[in-house]
Amino acid sequence: MAVMTPRRERSSLLSRALQVTAAAATALVTAVSLAAPAHAANPYERGPNPTDALLEASSGPFSVSEENVSRLSASGFGGGTIYYPRENNTYGAVAISPGYTGTEASIAWLGERIASHGFVVITIDTITTLDQPDSRAEQLNAALNHMINRASSTVRSRIDSSRLAVMGHSMGGGGTLRLASQRPDLKAAIPLTPWHLNKNWSSVTVPTLIIGADLDTIAPVATHAKPFYNSLPSSISKAYLELDGATHFAPNIPNKIIGKYSVAWLKRFVDNDTRYTQFLCPGPRDGLFGEVEEYRSTCPF
């Protein structure tokens, strides 16, 4: 019977320890390699890692081109402009409506801003400037259909028609809520200082960000934006952001808060890009001397 000397015993113990260490290291590397690419596996992720500075800038990381949609060529809406990233890839698509008596020019800045973060965006003129919210819902839907089916091949080839969203100002915001209630397949809705006679949107299941303005006397938040938000089901992803010191017409000029949180919402829910959750949960700080009067949501998303 062989007898193990102290030297051989120490050598054997060291060998077994090294084997155990190597096995543990291999298991750790395997676990890390499996867990690390979680967000990278998202096929809809576009653009660099987001920062506050990037989202608050006047334009995003993508160069943008435009395509005019004449009133004569438009079907079901009043024409407009399509903004799209020059980079050849597929993107979610967004339609944006102006408000009562407003024209496309009043929301044009949003088209270019959002497109520069990796979306195909159409800003529209309505058939008449006096069109009511439910008519604007129909026109937003027609604008989405135009981008998917009738725009140039350059635009159509860039659109992922399974990832659509709508936005609108004032009565366009009311139209946004109406279309969201009619099309649960939409990935996101963003009403901006919205106006609508209907106060109950409990049928909406689309992730919805409502942006109100504390000095709005046309669609006061107490009778519009807040009741709209409160009526949305608590089971859906939703958020309410109230601008501090802003009026009903805040969405008509470039606004870094509207731009930042609109892009973050679209990225999170149209692109399923969780890199943007950090800007929405817990969201902006509100209170005295800030740019945001109030923020609340159904975080976590």
Swiss-Prot record:
Where found? Secreted; Periplasm
Swapping residue 169 to A leads to an effect described as: Decreases activity on poly(ethylene terephthalate) (PET)
| Biotech applications | Has potential for application in biological recycling of plastic waste products. Shows promising applications in the laundry industry as a cleansing agent, as it is thermostable and tolerant to surfactants and organic solvents. Also shows promising applications in ethyl alcohol distillery processes as it may be utilized for treatment of molasses wastewater.
What is the relationship between pH and activity here?
A: Optimum pH is 8. Optimum pH is 6.0-6.5. Optimum pH is 7.5.
As given in the record, the signal peptide range reads 1-40
**Which residues catalyse the reaction?**
170 (nucleophile), 216 (charge relay system), 248 (charge relay system)
The cysteines joined by S-S bonds are 281-299
Q: Which InterPro entries match?
A: AB_hydrolase_fold, FrsA_esterase, PET_hydrolase/cutinase-like
Q: Where does poly(ethylene terephthalate) bind?
A: 100, 171, 195
Q: Which reaction does it catalyse?
A: pentanoate ester + H2O = pentanoate + an aliphatic alcohol + H(+); an octanoate ester + H2O = an aliphatic alcohol + octanoate + H(+); decanoate ester + H2O = decanoate + an aliphatic alcohol + H(+); a dodecanoate ester + H2O = an aliphatic alcohol + dodecanoate + H(+)
Keyword match Coiled coil: no
Q: In terms of temperature, how does the activity behave?
A: Optimum temperature is 25-50 degrees Celsius. Optimum temperature is 55 degrees Celsius. Optimum temperature is 60 degrees Celsius. Optimum temperature is 65 degrees Celsius.
**What does the record say about activity regulation?**
Activated by magnesium ions. Activated by calcium ions. Inhibited by the serine hydrolase inhibitor phenylmethanesulfonyl fluoride (PMSF).
CC per GO annotation: extracellular region; periplasmic space
Question: What job does this protein perform?
Answer: Catalyzes the hydrolysis of cutin, a polyester that forms the structure of plant cuticle. Shows esterase activity towards p-nitrophenol-linked aliphatic esters (pNP-aliphatic esters). Also hydrolyzes the triglycerides triacetin, tributyrin, tricaprin, and trilaurin, with a preference for short-chain substrates. Hydrolyzes the hemicellulose xylan. Capable of degrading the plastic poly(ethylene terephthalate) (PET), the most abundant polyester plastic in the world. Can also depolymerize poly(epsilon-caprolactone) (PCL), a synthetic aliphatic biodegradable polyester.
User: What family is it from?
Assistant: Belongs to the AB hydrolase superfamily.
Q: What is this protein called?
A: Cutinase cut2
User: Which source organism does the UniProt entry give?
Assistant: Thermobifida fusca (Thermomonospora fusca)
Could you read off the lineage of the organism from its UniProt record?
Answer: Bacteria, Bacillati, Actinomycetota, Actinomycetes, Streptosporangiales
Tell me the name of the encoding gene.
Answer: cut2
